[in-house]
């Protein structure tokens, strides 16, 4: 699927799966951490963006461990309040349920050296299941390409 842009060039319209770190960068308005090509993809309203319910679980776990420096834990006294705000502010992201099909794919993925995060395997499995490239800042994700994932790796910059 695609369209011809104003300059006469063919422009492919894409679906993208977002890793938790990208969701949080968007929520906290830290665009300076995004490479120009990734930022361009994320700002293009012709693209569609998806995430896994596993990312919501990861956000809840990060909240529980008080890993967010940019939020007031008195205002967000429960993790679900933070998740609700993230989902309302980033309404262009459709959250998809993690189901049996994704669990089966995750069970076939094998960890690469120095990477043991089961949430990451679940999120990658979800992207594989949906046949979408995943946008992530996790430098381990590209090491899974041989296992069927398509990764758009964003090397964080702190300009």
Question: Could you tell me what each predicted segment is?
Answer:
Residues 2-13, 124-159:
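Acidic, PIN/NYN-like endoribonuclease modules and their adjacent C-terminal/linker elements
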Residues 22-23, 55-56, 102, 123, ...:
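Alpha-helix capping/helix-boundary segments
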Residues 48, 92-94, 148-150:
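Conserved beta-strand segments of alpha/beta enzyme cores
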Residues 1-51, 68-83, 156-159:
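Short, well-structured N-terminal submotif of metal-dependent ribonuclease cores
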Residues 89-137:
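Active-site neighborhoods of divalent-metal-dependent phosphate/nucleic-acid chemistry enzymes
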Residues 51-54, 98:
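Short glycine/serine/threonine-enriched helix-capping/active-site loop
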Residues 59:
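Phosphate/NTP-binding elements of NTP-utilizing enzymes
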Residues 27-28, 63, 110, 145-146:
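Short, flexible helix/strand-to-coil boundary loops that buttress conserved ligand/catalytic motifs
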């Amino acid at each position: 699927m695609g369209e011809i842009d104003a300059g006469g060039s063919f422009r492919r319209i894409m679906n993208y799966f977002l890793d938790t770190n990208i969701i949080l960068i968007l929520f906290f308005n830290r665009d300076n951490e995004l490479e120009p090509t990734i930022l361009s993809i994320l700002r293009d309203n012709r693209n569609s963006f998806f995430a896994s319910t596993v990312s919501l679980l990861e956000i809840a776990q990060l909240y529980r461990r008080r890993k967010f420096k940019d939020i007031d834990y008195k205002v967000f006294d429960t993790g679900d309040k933070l998740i609700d705000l993230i989902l309302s502010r980033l309404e262009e992201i459709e959250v998809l349920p993690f189901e049996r099909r994704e669990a089966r794919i995750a069970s076939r993925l094998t960890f690469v050296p120095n990477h043991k995060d089961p949430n990451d395997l679940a999120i990658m499995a979800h992207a594989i299941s949906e046949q979408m490239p995943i946008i992530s800042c996790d430098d381990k994700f590209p090491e899974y390409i041989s296992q069927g994932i398509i990764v758009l790796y964003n090397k964080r910059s702190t300009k």
